[in-house]
A protein has these predicted regions:
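Contiguous segments within soluble domain cores/interaction surfaces
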Residues: 2-127
Length: 127
């Protein structure tokens, strides 16, 4: 029986530095909400950093969707990634550019791997 991929880490930040010598990841400017003076607002750049385990060997697909209405989420990002073994921890650095928020609110966010939800959460955008 194949296990479901597990999300070990989900962090929103300003950037990720990867040390060329050690391969260690340093997360810069971690945040959990967005504040704006007026709406609509466009956030110029952020990184969604994920660590995933229990992925069977081979190619997989991650999709991240977002929206104010949790029943009508729009895909923001969809891309492939590879897994060598279910024992490996896979760090995925997802750069999000020019993300628009039409109004303040709690925006629902859904992360799926191979069309299977692994996290449903929200990000608060306030004025």
């Amino acid at each position: 029986m194949q296990s479901k991929p597990q999300l070990l880490t989900w962090i929103t930040c300003d950037g990720v530095h990867i040390d060329p010598g050690s391969g260690k990841h340093t997360l810069l400017g971690v945040f959990s909400n967005i504040q704006a003076r007026q709406f609509p607002v466009t956030h110029p750049f952020m990184v969604w950093f994920l660590t995933i385990s229990d992925c069977s060997p081979g190619q997989h697909r991650i999709r991240i969707s977002l929206g104010l209405d949790p029943t009508a989420l729009q895909p923001l990002l969809e891309r492939p990634f590879d897994s060598a073994s279910p024992l490996h921890r896979i760090n995925l650095i997802n750069e999000i550019r020019n993300l628009s928020f039409p109004q303040a609110g709690d925006y629902s966010l859904l992360i799926e791997i191979d069309d299977e939800p692994i996290l449903a959460t929200s990000i608060t955008v306030s004025g």
